[in-house]
Amino acid sequence: YTSSKLGYVTVKGVFNGSTLTVSEDAKYSVSVVDAPSSLGLSALTGHIVTVTGYYAGLAEPVQRIMATDVEDNGLNEIVYFLENFEWLEPWSVASGVGQTVETDNLDAKATALTSITVDGVTAFDAVEKLGYKFIYDKNDNKRIYLQQNYLKFGKTGNHAGIILPPIDGVPEAKDNVTLSFDWCGMRQGSGKIDPVNLIVIFENGSDKVQIDIPELGWEDGHKLEWVRAEVSLKGITVNKDTKITITQTQWEVGTANRWFRDNIKISEPIKL
């Protein structure tokens, strides 16, 4: 790998868009140059890939390779839990809901989960049948809404959150396991961004750990976009008896603190 005399080579590592990281201890990384679009490398960021090609020299600290073949070995992570709610597509289609975040459209249709029925089952019940549990204030369960395969929580004066289903198989005493999810706050007609303060709560019996999610900090008029929240599980037990709640600190207040959430995952990177 460090030789300057290699000809036709094969290298395996994590692809980040233009380079391969072979291992944390490797002296050099590998830059993939002149790769034809037919190899599909642009779609493999974050994957472990095996690249075969011609050695094209060293430009310290980067070895260069002209790729002729690429093998995708999957994402560079072990996934213990994943939920993207794509299975809600039948309810999304039935209700004609929109995509507020992706289109930055405050008028995109959002329908209460309790009001959308497919085959006799509401979207609200379909989610809870998978082990989730919604929480909401004022005894009003109509304030969790469906967008196109993701969820919107709250309206002015009403607030909500979600408890994850039981999750098993997450290793203890690991420093690099994380819980992550995509979220976005709602923008008001005036341009003000709803001041949402999200928290993640882990409960194991009487033990309770609360993690604050950084605020968006957006200026008025900011375009809506997904933000990735990550919570380290270092020192936190997660098993089938753990209650994990993603919610907001604002509760029983009359303000607008609306938010969207998608793509919940518990994972750890694979060490090469």
Language-model region placement:
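Exposed beta-strand face motif in extracellular beta-rich ectodomains
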Residues: 47-49, 177, 240-244
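Terminal, low-complexity interaction segments
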Residues: 202, 207-272
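Extended, low-complexity, turn-rich repeat/linker tracts enriched in Gly/Pro/Ser/Thr and Asp/Glu
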Residues: 157, 171-173, 184-195, 252-254
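Short, surface-exposed beta-strand/strand-loop-strand elements in extracellular ectodomains
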Residues: 193-204
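Short beta-strands within extracellular/lumenal beta-sheet-rich domains
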Residues: 149-178, 228-230, 261
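Extracellular carbohydrate-recognition regions
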Residues: 74-126
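Extra-cytoplasmic beta-strand recognition segments
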Residues: 13-15, 85, 164-188
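OB-fold and OB-like single-stranded nucleic-acid-recognition modules
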Residues: 1-76
